[in-house]
């Protein structure tokens, strides 16, 4: 058996440079401190044996180069080589080199591909993917903690059955799908076989059904031929009768044309008059509109004049105020000028007096030259003696001058403050006057605004009321027009009704209180639903005229005859015989007395209503009406809500469409009232439109009110600003100035007290200085004849100072007065400009008022003229309206003539209409019969035309105007009239039937026979008429499905075979490994435990396919009962995991086994057991290379490889090799040393 002999490393991880490690013995231990690089040596062995980079604790291959992790790679390449030795064979070298970012593989220094490299290693029993040659650090604990599923994955990896998992899953899916397809096609084939059987039965039923259907068709043709034959006979008869009546109508038409021509002429004249009347109405409307436009202009002109007058009054007041200010300012300025003249005069008088005093003083103090020198010398000497005093006096003088300047400044400020206070007082006065003026203007504006608002409110109310009323009138007019439109009274009928209404009014006037009116006008059904029923019961009595007596009725009939009116029915209340109402009928359920569902007025016409209604009952439906009429022992007259009437005699009459039209007359009797309402509303609408036209005037007033409101707002804002800003600010500044003025007095007095006090001190100093001067100048004073030297100096200097001071006072007064005078002049000019401005404003406003008054008068004149023209037009309109009424009366007389002719024409037209209606009905019946034959696919025998010539009526589109519905129907009838039917198949007995009852009896017989045949046909469930086609289709489908089923069955068989093949291969791989491990594990566990009572066994959860489920692993520790793996102690678990690990390794064992710290979790006892086991196995089964930190373990090895670190930029690992075979068990316990 071969073994790993040497490892050569160059710049790999912590191993810098080239290092040769080895030789490795059968049991070699790698030892060294933590962090020295022991695991890196294991990584080197893994690397050279082809392990992936990700399992070497780095991200990229470059990181394996020494120094690369700290950014200082020792070289750009690294490599690891392994020398493998076998007995009787040459050593082989396997090397893996890092070049750039990839690996290069070499065998005996020859570069090979990775797959060749892997194959060579596999030949030696080294499986790269299964990693059967190494155990990483922590792998033992990981194996101990694995669950059954994870153990299965481990076995899949070791046995390489996992490589077949993807192909296994794929083939299993294909097999399942193929089996599903086979099952689907089997069921489909079974279903189609059932369909084939069902189709055969359907075909037999269809043949029988077709025979019965042919018999029904023959009976239908016979019935339809019978109906059509007698229909055509009736149409021919009606056509002859219609032609005769049309000739009579032509004669009456010619007679009516003459009367109508006369009526047309009158209409033209009436039309002309009405157009003239409309023109006058148009002119009235235009003048009215013009007047409505002019009135706002007049109001605006009047408002402008009023506004300008108010403005003028305000300007005059402003002018008066400005003139008052100007006079006051002029007086103040005159006073200042007088004061200026007074000061100038005083100054001149002072100058003159000084001149006189100068001349009057004759004394001359002029010195000689030697005396002057002496004076200066003595003066210098005196100055030296009094130098100290002079310095003190100079200091006092400086202080005194500073205080005097302060005093002058305060007095000047005081004067300026007094002037400012006067100015503020004037401004305050102006502010107060402006406030008074603004308050007066605001009061006036508010009054004007109230007036405008009042006027606006009145106009708004009037216009809004007019708008609302116009909307209401328009709504009412629309309702009236809709109701009038719904009445659908044609022109002739309207004229007839108008004629009858006029006669009715005439006889009411002739016999007041005796003629009550028509029955329809005096009563009304309580609910709309009873209208048709009440109409049916009242019948012809609806239009009967109710009178109080028979005599009144006869007189009325005579009057109608004289007026050539239509015949009328009269119901005299004293002549009618009425049976009393049967009170028992009121107790019947589902019925009411007709008289109880009618309201009537006046009460005494009840007799006439009882006569018309009798004891008739109204019911909700036809069934109730029939039941009550004929169902009891006594018959009653009843009527349903739809108008179906059941007479006691047994006669039943239906609610025809003309009855509904007649029932609408309950609503039509309000037409006259609606017309009157329409006229009244139209007139009111015109009046309201006039009021609505005042909107322009309202907008004008609103605009003026808005302008006035804005001016008022600005004035109020100005007033508020003047009060709160200008006046308040001036008062505040005045108060501040007065406060400052009050402070000037104390400050000036304080300065004056300081100056007076200092003057006293200066006086004392001067006296001391004077004593020194007197001593020095004593002899000199005697020489010049003065008491002391000061008398000489003061005479000359004092006078000059006094004069200068006095002149300064005069100048100050003139300057102050000049400043005030300049200010007053400027203010006076401003006041004069204001006076001039207000004078111009007053003059301009007066001129504008004159113009505005003229404009106001001009608008007033236009309004008066327009109103006069409007009144003239209204008079013309009344005259023209009278002419139109007269012309209407003339036309009414002609209409009466036309009415007589129209009556005869109407009678004939009614007869023609009746014939045409019957004829139209017969044509419609023929059309319906033909259409029914076409729709029911009844093939009639035709001698001319085809069934395609029979038309089906379709509704015309909304936009179709070319052909009306009736015209289209006529075209259809005409086209169908060309169809000739061959009645040869119709029995002669059926053709000979003439009487209506006979025809009806024969038709019922034919219909009954047809019904019996159809009943038999209907009882047979409609078969599938396409049964033959279905049968052929099902046969084809059955053959197709059988083919598909056979193909699916073959595919399923093939897929199952393919799956079984891959399943077997996967099972064989897995089972070979599992059986090997399961067989060896118990023996290995006993050897590791050093006890034959220890047991270990593996069991698959799924014996048939163990790789699909988990693998259970259980151990019984020596001297203990069976417990699950989870309940074993840490050491026991580790020993069990090692047993599994060594058992797995025993399956296709690698020649060497590299283990990284497998003793980490073992106690000393178990360490010894494991070490001894490994030592035993290494002698015969495999070479063991173990990384360990425990002496109890590595002392059992044959050689030691020691790894120690050296410090540099990163850790550098160095290696020492120590052969222990030279010291066999010399020191079994090194700790004793």
UniProtKB/Swiss-Prot annotation:
Involved in chromosome cohesion during cell cycle and in DNA repair. Involved in DNA repair via its interaction with BRCA1 and its related phosphorylation by ATM, and works as a downstream effector in the ATM/NBS1 branch of S-phase checkpoint. Central component of cohesin complex. The cohesin complex is required for the cohesion of sister chromatids after DNA replication. The cohesin complex apparently forms a large proteinaceous ring within which sister chromatids can be trapped. At anaphase, the complex is cleaved and dissociates from chromatin, allowing sister chromatids to segregate. It is found in: Nucleus; Chromosome; Chromosome, Centromere. ATP binds at residues 32-39. The modification Phosphoserine is found at residues 358, 360, 957, 962, 966, 970. Belongs to the SMC family. SMC1 subfamily. The modification N6-acetyllysine is found at residues 648, 713, 1037. The flexible SMC hinge domain, which separates the large intramolecular coiled coil regions, allows the heterotypic interaction with the corresponding domain of SMC3, forming a V-shaped heterodimer. The two heads of the heterodimer are then connected by different ends of the cleavable RAD21 protein, forming a ring structure. Residues 284-293 have a biased composition (Basic and acidic residues). Forms a heterodimer with SMC3 in cohesin complexes. Cohesin complexes are composed of the SMC1 (SMC1A or meiosis-specific SMC1B) and SMC3 heterodimer attached via their SMC hinge domain, RAD21 which link them, and one STAG protein (STAG1, STAG2 or meiosis-specific STAG3), which interacts with RAD21. In germ cell cohesin complexes, SMC1A is mutually exclusive with SMC1B. Found in a complex with CDCA5, SMC3 and RAD21, PDS5A/SCC-112 and PDS5B/APRIN. Interacts with NDC80, SYCP2, STAG3, BRCA1 and BRAT1. Residues 515-629 form the SMC hinge domain. Residues 104-124, 163-503, 660-935, 991-1068 form a coiled coil. Residues 284-308, 348-369, 947-968 are annotated as: Disordered. Phosphorylated upon ionizing radiation or DNA methylation. Phosphorylation of Ser-957 and Ser-966 activates it and is required for S-phase checkpoint activation. Ubiquitinated by the DCX(DCAF15) complex, leading to its degradation. The gene is SMC1A. PANTHER family: STRUCTURAL MAINTENANCE OF CHROMOSOMES PROTEIN 1A (PTHR18937:SF170), STRUCTURAL MAINTENANCE OF CHROMOSOMES SMC FAMILY MEMBER (PTHR18937). One of its GO terms (biological process) is response to DNA damage checkpoint signaling. Pfam families: SMC_hinge (PF06470), SMC_N (PF02463). Changing residue 966 to A: Abolishes binding with RPGR. It comes from the Eukaryota. Residues 953-967 have a biased composition (Low complexity). One of its GO terms (molecular function) is ATP hydrolysis activity. InterPro entries: P-loop_NTPase, RecF/RecN/SMC_N, SMC, Smc1_ABC, SMC_hinge, SMC_hinge_sf. This is Structural maintenance of chromosomes protein 1A.
């Amino acid at each position: 058996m071969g073994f790993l002999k040497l490892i050569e490393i160059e710049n790999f991880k912590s191993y810098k440079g080239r290092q040769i490690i080895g030789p490795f013995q059968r049991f070699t231990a790698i030892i060294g401190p933590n962090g020295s690089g022991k695991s890196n040596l294991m990584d080197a062995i893994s690397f050279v044996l082809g392990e992936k980079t990700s399992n070497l604790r780095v991200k990229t291959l470059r990181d394996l180069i020494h120094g690369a992790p700290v950014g200082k790679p020792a070289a750009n390449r690294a490599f690891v080589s392994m020398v493998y030795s076998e007995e009787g064979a040459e050593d082989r070298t396997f090397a893996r080199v890092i070049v750039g970012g990839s690996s290069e593989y070499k065998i005996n220094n020859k570069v090979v591909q990775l797959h060749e490299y892997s194959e060579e290693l596999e030949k030696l029993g080294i499986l790269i993917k299964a990693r059967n040659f190494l155990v990483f650090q922590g792998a033992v604990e990981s194996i101990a903690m694995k669950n059954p599923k994870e153990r299965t994955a481990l076995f899949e990896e070791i046995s390489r059955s996992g490589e077949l998992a993807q192909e296994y899953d794929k083939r299993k899916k294909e097999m399942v799908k193929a089996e599903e397809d086979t099952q689907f096609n089997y069921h489909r084939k079974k279903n189609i076989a059932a369909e084939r059987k069902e189709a055969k039965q359907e075909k037999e039923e269809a043949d029988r059904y077709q025979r019965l259907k042919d018999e029904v068709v023959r009976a239908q043709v016979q019935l339809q031929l019978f109906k059509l034959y007698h229909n055509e006979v009736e149409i021919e008869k009606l056509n002859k009768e219609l032609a005769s009546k049309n000739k009579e109508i032509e004669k009456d038409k010619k007679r009516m044309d003459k009367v109508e021509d006369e009526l047309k002429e009158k209409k033209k004249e009436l039309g002309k008059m009405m157009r003239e009347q409309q023109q006058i109405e148009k002119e009235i409307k235009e003048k009215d509109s013009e007047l409505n436009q002019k009135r706002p202009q007049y109001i605006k002109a009047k408002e402008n004049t009023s506004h300008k007058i108010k403005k003028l009054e305000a300007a005059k007041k402003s002018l008066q105020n400005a003139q008052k200010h100007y006079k006051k300012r002029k007086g103040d300025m005159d006073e200042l000028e007088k004061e200026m003249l007074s000061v100038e005069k005083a100054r001149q008088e002072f100058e003159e007096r000084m001149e006189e005093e100068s001349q009057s003083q004759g004394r001359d103090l002029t010195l000689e030259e030697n005396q002057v020198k002496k004076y200066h010398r003595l003066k210098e000497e005196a100055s030296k003696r009094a130098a100290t005093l002079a310095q003190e006096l100079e200091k006092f003088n400086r202080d005194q001058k500073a205080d005097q300047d302060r005093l002058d400044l305060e007095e000047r400020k005081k004067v300026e403050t007094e002037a400012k206070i006067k100015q503020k007082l004037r401004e305050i006065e102006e502010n107060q006057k402006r406030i008074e003026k603004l308050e007066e203007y605001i009061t006036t504006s508010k009054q004007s605004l109230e007036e405008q608002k009042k006027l606006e409110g009145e106009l708004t109310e009037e216009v809004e009321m007019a708008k609302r009323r116009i909307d209401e009138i328009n709504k009412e007019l629309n309702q009236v027009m809709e109701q009038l439109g719904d009445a659908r009274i044609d022109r002739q009928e309207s004229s007839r009704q108008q004629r009858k209404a006029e006669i009715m009014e005439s006889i009411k006037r002739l016999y007041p209180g005796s003629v009550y009116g028509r029955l329809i006008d005096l009563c009304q059904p309580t609910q709309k639903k009873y209208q048709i029923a009440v109409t049916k019961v009242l019948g012809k009595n609806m239009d009967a005229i109710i009178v109080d007596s028979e005599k009144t009725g006869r007189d009325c009939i005579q009057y109608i005859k004289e007026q050539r009116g239509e015949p009328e029915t009269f119901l005299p209340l004293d002549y009618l015989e009425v049976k009393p109402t049967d009170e028992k009928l009121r107790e019947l359920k589902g019925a009411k007395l007709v008289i109880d569902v009618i309201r009537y007025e006046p009460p005494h016409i009840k007799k006439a209503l009882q006569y018309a209604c009798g004891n008739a009952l109204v019911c909700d439906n036809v069934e109730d009406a029939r039941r009550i009429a004929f169902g009891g022992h006594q018959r009653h007259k009843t009527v349903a809500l739809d108008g179906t009437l059941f007479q006691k005699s047994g006669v039943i009459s239906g609610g025809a469409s003309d009855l509904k039209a007649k029932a609408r007359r309950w609503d039509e009797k309000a037409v006259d009232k609606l017309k009157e309402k329409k006229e009244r509303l139209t007139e009111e609408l015109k009046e309201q439109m006039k009021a609505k036209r005042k909107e322009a005037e309202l907008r004008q007033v609103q605009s003026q009110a808005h302008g006035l409101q804005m001016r008022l707002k600005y004035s109020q804002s100005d007033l508020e600003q003047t009060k709160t800003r200008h006046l308040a600010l001036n008062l505040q500044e005045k108060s501040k100035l007065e406060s400052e003025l009050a402070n000037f007095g104390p400050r000036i007095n304080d300065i004056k007290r300081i100056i007076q006090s200092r003057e006293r001190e200066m006086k004392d100093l001067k006296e001391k200085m004077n004593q020194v001067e007197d001593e020095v100048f004593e002899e000199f004073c005697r020489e010049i004849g003065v008491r002391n030297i000061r008398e000489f100096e003061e005479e000359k200097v004092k006078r000059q100072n006094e004069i200068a001071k006095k002149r300064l006072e005069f100048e100050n007064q003139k300057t102050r007065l000049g400043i005030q005078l300049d200010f007053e002049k400027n203010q006076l000019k401003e006041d004069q400009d204001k006076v001039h401005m207000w004078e111009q404003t007053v003059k301009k406003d007066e001129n504008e008022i004159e113009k505005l008054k003229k404009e106001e008068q001009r608008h007033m004149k236009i309004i008066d003229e327009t109103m006069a023209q409007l009144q003239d037009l209204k008079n013309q309109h009344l005259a023209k309206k009278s002419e139109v009424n007269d012309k209407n009366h003339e036309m009414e007389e002609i209409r009466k003539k036309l009415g007589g002719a129209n009556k005869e024409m109407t009678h004939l037209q009614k007869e023609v209409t009746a014939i045409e209606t019957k004829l139209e009905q017969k044509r419609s019946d023929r059309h319906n019969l033909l259409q029914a034959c076409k729709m029911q696919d009844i093939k009639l025998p035709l001698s001319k035309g085809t069934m395609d010539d029979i038309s089906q009526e379709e509704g015309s589109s909304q936009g179709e105007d070319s052909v009306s519905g009736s015209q289209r129907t006529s075209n259809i009838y005409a086209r169908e009239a060309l169809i000739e039917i061959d009645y040869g198949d119709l029995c002669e007995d059926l053709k000979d039937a003439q009487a209506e009852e006979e025809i009806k009896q024969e038709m019922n017989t034919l219909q009954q026979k047809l019904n019996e045949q159809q009943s038999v046909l209907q009882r047979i469930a409609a078969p599938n008429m396409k049964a033959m086609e279905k049968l052929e289709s099902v046969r084809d489908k059955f053959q197709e499905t059988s083919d598909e089923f056979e193909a699916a069955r073959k595919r399923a068989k093939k897929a199952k075979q393919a799956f079984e093949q891959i399943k077997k291969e996967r099972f064989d791989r897995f089972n070979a490994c599992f059986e090997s491990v399961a067989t060896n594990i118990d023996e290995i566990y006993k050897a590791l435990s050093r006890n034959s009572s220890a047991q270990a066994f593996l069991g698959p959860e799924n014996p048939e396919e163990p790789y699909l489920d988990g693998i259970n692993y259980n151990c019984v520790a020596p001297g203990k009962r069976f417990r699950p793996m989870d309940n074993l102690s840490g050491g026991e678990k580790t020993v069990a995991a090692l047993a599994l690990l060594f058992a797995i390794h025993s399956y296709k064992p690698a020649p060497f086994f590299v283990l990284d710290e497998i003793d980490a979790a073992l106690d000393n006892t178990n360490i010894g057991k494991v070490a001894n086991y490994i030592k035993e196995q290494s002698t015969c089964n495999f070479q063991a290379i173990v990384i360990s930190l425990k002496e109890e373990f590595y002392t059992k090895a044959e050689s030691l490889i020691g790894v120690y670190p050296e410090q540099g930029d990163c850790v550098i690992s160095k290696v020492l090799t120590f052969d222990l075979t030279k010291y066999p068990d010399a020191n079994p316990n090194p700790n004793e040393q």
